[in-house]
């Protein structure tokens, strides 16, 4: 069992705990053998390598952090690992609970608890290397013992009848952890000058979008001041209603409220919003400030906010015209604390309704509102996130996590690149380049992975036939919608092709688009039947088991009076997403890393279903050959790993270029 203590850097409003910060350093390393022989290295680290050489398994809680520090400090370890954090995550079967060492120690009532002695030091931002060494050593010792005790508990749990089926998932998850640590260590080179250009483009577009929205809001709301960044005020604009009493409003609705009762309560608990006319406040003459006078008639030097107009300078007098877009939120699930939700999913639904009814102003407004939200995210999460986390070596060290999502699909941090829009047009991708002059960036992307996995899991004959013959499903989607009366390009049709797999319906779509959603379930009867079997399985057993052995529990599942099963979207999604992106993608990631181990080229990221490689200029054809080898052996590898017969073709499509965006197909 191993744990490290290191200094941290405060930069850009963030804590940086990694070894890539110039001022960060290793302070202490602790090791505990299975014979409870403890060794702490404080001032010198001689002997650490000897322990690593003798280790058969390295146990840690968040082992990636420990591996990075060991590797960056020159130590070598390429053996097996057992990450207690990841093992506990797998054992939770999608029913997520806190995974910190402290939380795990308390949950399993370990004899050794994580010590509180350091919390005051951390709270006061005392540098690790300035904490008294004996106190730090005691803290490290407690962590080592707690981690070892936890590993014993988890290993015993894994060998019980209830959880033994998860052993293969645990083994794969730990193997992947080492690969993700290597990706983290490799880093992805950032062209900072290009990043600044992208930021300028986004800021210019944001200003133009805000200008259009402000003009539209004035038309919709009259003179009522509206903050475009306020979800509450956007709710007024979109739904034309305002809660009378927020506390009462929040306590009135439940997600599964009867539709008739829901509509009745909306009318009773909210008021219609009307357009207003601004009239100058007589008290402050439009200035928003007043100067009070003392009893002796002498005015005060400082002014005060005008109470009559609340400092706005105007009174907003309601007219008889209803303000806003006048949409109705269809169910109680759309309720928020301040009115109604304005999240991306619901705005897309409303946009579909507006398009269906040819409400052009509403379509324009909702399109711009979503774009403004996207631009804010691009600037804060991506541009600023990349700037903050790009290290002195000029690289963004991509941190991929296996324990954040319910399904095991990778999530990202610092920043989360998994939120990157799909497709080959996102400008931020152009800032990522090769570390070598003349080097290239190659992206290997699984073709229709989740659809193909759905075809396999359901054994839908139509889907399997289409995949096997290379049938162009996007062109087919385009044809269905076009034939229904709405000309649609293949590119635009892509947004609809697989949406029904994830629970999307024809609600809020145009009539022609809705036709495709109906057509999907009729066409893929095998997938529809499989969804029904999954629901019955969960009602009967409370859980789903995937071909890899990974499990998902649904302790609160129920069937309502109309026969519908709760959590149905998750029941449909989890098996597909987990087997595709938490099992197959990581397995192939490991294989590609093994194939690249004798080359200079290296994996630098994985986003969605893709794997990104920084390619040395002398190894372009070698890396392309690696992807071809992986393609030819992929099915055999999956069948061997999971002991299954996989009868659906899989393919990594690859493209290469001078940066991550500007690429051309090579496979």
Where are these regions (language model features)?
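Conserved catalytic palm subdomain of right-hand nucleotidyl-transferase polymerases, strongest
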Residues: 1, 61, 81-85, 434-450, ...
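Conserved "right-hand" nucleotidyltransferase catalytic core of DNA-directed polymerases
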Residues: 1-14, 21-24, 28-30, 107, ...
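Active-site-proximal helix-loop-helix substrate-binding element of RNase H-like nuclease domains
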Residues: 22-160, 172, 477-482, 488
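Short active-site loop/helix that positions an aromatic residue
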Residues: 64-75, 87-92, 234-243, 447-462, ...
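Catalytic palm subdomain of template-directed nucleic-acid polymerases
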Residues: 90-94, 182-206, 454, 505-509, ...
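Polymerase palm active-site segment centered on the conserved acidic dipeptide of motif C
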Residues: 148, 197-232, 520-531, 618-667
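Conserved catalytic core of nucleic-acid polymerases
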Residues: 178, 185, 279-301, 312-315, ...
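Function-dense linear segments that define catalytic or interfacial modules
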Residues: 399-486
